[in-house]
């Protein structure tokens, strides 16, 4: 899947795996009260929101995949002079389907198709997202099992994740390098989730006692990072 490319500096390539999970969740109190008092109003609001998502025919649809470098914002503008998507991607009228933290790296999908955007980001679509995560320390199976069952964060219980220990992926070196503690080992994990809460994966690994040192998103649904290097982008056909 390829056509147009754009590039900056980068070094090596990558591979990994994906997974899928069951959906569950709790409405917050305000949403619950609104549903009880005005069920038809809530249904109308949902229908209106769905109708407002731009539908684009296949001939006009744009889908960009991008390897976001470390220390780059997942947006096109910034008033403080920090690096943004605009420093790398000249394509107009495309929007990110899910963000990455400034200190995270890897796959971003940008599109002008609101339906595709929702499919990749909304938990109800059960679209898996796989991250390669380097953690401080050496988690054991009983630690990883907690993530597989779900952990309680400040914003609620996480859905079950697919988690496995992997060999260190053959990818580019981060700039700046990750800071290691000489006497503490590090471990690479492949973590697959269907949610997208703020800094969720980092909070999950911290919750079980193994802080994230480096986080690289490898895939979203069936879309993978492939051999894109940091700062490179490519327009694809789905």
Swiss-Prot record:
Active site positions, chain numbering:
101 (nucleophile)
> What is catalyzed by this enzyme?
uridine(2457) in 23S rRNA = pseudouridine(2457) in 23S rRNA
Return the broad EC class.
Answer: isomerase
Enzyme Commission number, as recorded: 5.4.99.20
Q: Where is the composition biased (Basic residues)?
A: 9-26, 36-53
Per its UniProt entry, which superkingdom is the organism in?
A: Bacteria
Q: Where is this region: Disordered?
A: 1-54
Write the protein's name: Ribosomal large subunit pseudouridine synthase E
Q: From what organism does this protein derive?
A: Vibrio parahaemolyticus serotype O3:K6 (strain RIMD 2210633)
Gene symbol?
A: rluE
């Amino acid at each position: 899947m390829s056509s147009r490319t754009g590039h900056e500096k980068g070094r090596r390539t990558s591979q990994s795996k994906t997974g899928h999970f069951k959906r569950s969740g709790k409405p917050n109190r305000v949403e619950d009260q609104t549903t009880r008092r005005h069920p038809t109003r809530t249904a109308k609001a949902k229908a209106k929101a769905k109708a407002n998502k731009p539908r684009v025919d296949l001939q006009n649809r744009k889908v960009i995949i991008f390897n976001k470098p470390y220390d780059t914002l997942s947006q096109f503008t910034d008033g403080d002079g920090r690096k943004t998507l605009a420093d790398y991607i000249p394509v107009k009228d495309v929007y990110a389907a899910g963000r990455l933290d400034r200190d995270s790296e890897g796959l971003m999908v940008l599109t002008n198709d609101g339906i595709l955007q929702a499919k990749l980001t909304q938990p109800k679509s059960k679209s898996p997202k796989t991250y390669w995560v380097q953690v401080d320390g050496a988690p054991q199976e009983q630690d990883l099992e907690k993530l597989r069952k779900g952990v309680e964060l400040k914003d609620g219980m996480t859905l079950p994740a697919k988690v496995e220990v992997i060999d260190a992926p053959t990818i580019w070196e981060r700039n700046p390098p990750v800071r290691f503690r000489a006497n503490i080992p590090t471990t690479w994990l492949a973590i697959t989730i269907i949610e997208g809460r703020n800094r969720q994966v980092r909070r999950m690994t911290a919750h079980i006692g193994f802080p994230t040192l480096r986080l690289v998103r490898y895939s979203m649904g069936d879309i993978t990072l492939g051999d894109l290097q940091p700062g490179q982008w490519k327009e694809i056909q789905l």
